[in-house]
Amino acid sequence: MAKSLAVALRATGGARVMRRAGREREGCSDTRCRCQRWRRRLQGFGLAAAGGNRYRNKHHYRPAGGDPWDPCYRPMIISTSCAGATRS
């Protein structure tokens, strides 16, 4: 049964999501920029595909700083410690 579940997850892309969630838990004291919200809005209007945006909905990890007009100017703090932290 576990094998069939793994095959089903692999076919639907669920395995990729599970792997990504596990990877995010490791980098607990990192910052995540706010670009994802902006990129989703642009994709809704079909502008991201025309612009050749290869990052699409991925988050960009970068230190704080930059230009005030940049959506990554004030990054979100993911977490300062991993103790008992759960993510959905």
From Swiss-Prot:
Entry superkingdom: Eukaryota
A molecular-function term among this protein's GO annotations: RNA binding
Record key words, sorted: RNA-binding, Stress response
Induction of its expression: By cold stress.
Extra remark: Contains several arginine residues in close proximity which may be involved in protein RNA interactions.
Name used for this protein in its record: Cold-regulated protein BLT14
Naturally occurring in which organism (per UniProt): Hordeum vulgare (Barley)
